[in-house]
Amino acid sequence: MVTTGAVVGASSGCSRVATADTGDGGHLLEQLRAKGTVRLGIAGEQPYGYIGADGEITGSAPAIATRIFRRLGVDRVEPFPTEFGSLIFGLNSLQFDVVAAGMYINPERCEQVLFADPEYQMKDAFIVPRGNPKKLRTYADIARAGARMATGIGYAEIDYAKDAGVKRIDTLPDQLAGLLAVEQGRVDVFVGTAVTVRNVVEQTKSTKVEATDEVTPYLDGKPVVDVGGFAFRLPERNLWAAFNRELHKMKRSGELLDVMRPFGFTKDQMTDIKAEEKCRP
């Protein structure tokens, strides 16, 4: 494994573009086996994929990927940290091989990448000042209060907030930046996935903010069940299919929950939803 600095340095000036789909399912799996290494695109977001205090890649998605790729004959994983909003571009410009960031699956993204079936389902939660003085428990509450909201760059929560009528939306690099913005009074609320919000509040031991209970987002008046999964380049169907087979074996055996539990996931976040269901417009 390599450190953050080594990977970022290696990415400078990358101008490669993805090759066209030849219709044969791609050859990336064979290439990865020959190299013995797979590069994972991560967004530095706990608990999905990030660099730990020891300089090594960690998180639920890299932990899953490490097991699956070893079974596919690829023994090493390397991190490629980038901003969340750059993950799909980075994947399709060949900067790394797989997005391992717990990325939500939606129709817009499905036009650009090939998703494995999701490894988890998730609701949202808010970071608010201690005591939640504005009583923000839903997106509609944020809109009614005229509150200043922040979320991550490229997050699905932006659309949920707009759908609820939220007018003041800032974007920040990650959930830690969001927590600090709430602490310092620059925003009234930071919105993220429930497990992400809970983890960052617990780990920072902040006395100035708190995490709300889980929040169900809505689009067009309908509740949304978000699911997250690994993303592959569209031509690489052979790698995608092999990865998906191993992922389903982990689901059936209960191994998937065992791998994800140390990162704050529970049985409630396990899902049988298929990627194709979330890719439909």
Q: Which positions does each model-derived feature cover?
A:
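Ligand-binding clefts/hinges and TM-proximal coupling segments of bilobed small-molecule sensing domains
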Residues: 16-22, 156-169, 241-281
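Short helices/loops that flank or line small-molecule/ion binding pockets
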Residues: 67-71, 78-81, 85-99, 112-114, ...
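Extended ligand-binding regions for polar small-molecule ligands
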Residues: 62-71, 132-133, 140, 223-267
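Flexible hinge/capping segments at coil-to-helix
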Residues: 31, 129-147
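Hydrophobic/proline-rich hinge and linker segments of small-molecule sensing/allosteric domains
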Residues: 39-45, 115-137, 230-233
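Periplasmic-binding protein-like
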Residues: 121-125, 205-244, 267-281
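A ligand-binding cleft/hinge motif common to bilobed small-molecule-binding domains
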Residues: 103-111, 159-160, 188-224
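Extracytoplasmic small-molecule ligand-binding "clamshell" domains
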Residues: 2-4, 8, 21-102, 111
